[in-house]
Amino acid sequence: MPNDDAYPNGRIFLFYNTGNNNEGQVRKGNGLRQVWYKTSIDNGQIWSEGINITLQVHRPKQPQINPTYNFEEDWRSFANTPGHALQFQNEKYKGRIFVSANHSQGNPKKNFTDYVANGYYTDDHGKIFRISDDVGIAGSNESMAAELSHNKLMMNSRNQRGDIRAKIVSISSNGGATWDTSYFDKTLIDPVNEGSILTIGHKKGKNIIAFCNAANIKRRDTLYYA
């Protein structure tokens, strides 16, 4: 995707979600999360009006609130990444904006296995969004992604179940549309917490990735970075 000619100096995208009840009640079906974005062309001094993209990136079943929110998937809690989205900088998917996310589906389940991580993306500067597949691990939750080399994407997710105290890593070779693999990286120990991942450079044909989290299986302590 080329740069948007209408904004030669670029735009900042701010993705966010709103809700009419707390997460616990939304998870039980007693509330709604909606998904939005705003943009700025002056480095965040002034922002556009919010654009509601709930119908494109979320699957709520709340027709009593909005008759169009009547998806059989019955997603309930929904959250964008606690950190940054990303825009692909190189190769086939250059320009694509990808936002990590997670949602719960249906009634609450034991050990938070109604939650799962996924994402959504746009190839036309926010006109149309598409939902990525869910990652293959129930209980995956807060997530953040970074661009790897050779058209690949890595997403790093929290394990809300808490049974394995390590980060969940998912790899995509098609820009985040689907996932080649999802697994627990037991070298990245974690106390059930969010971690941060960021592409910080490029050297010898490969992207350089920075990672930071609380590297402790019992408490949010022992800051680790690599």
Q: Predicted segments — roles?
A:
Residues M1-A226:
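Asp-box/BNR beta-propeller blade signature and adjacent active/binding-site loops
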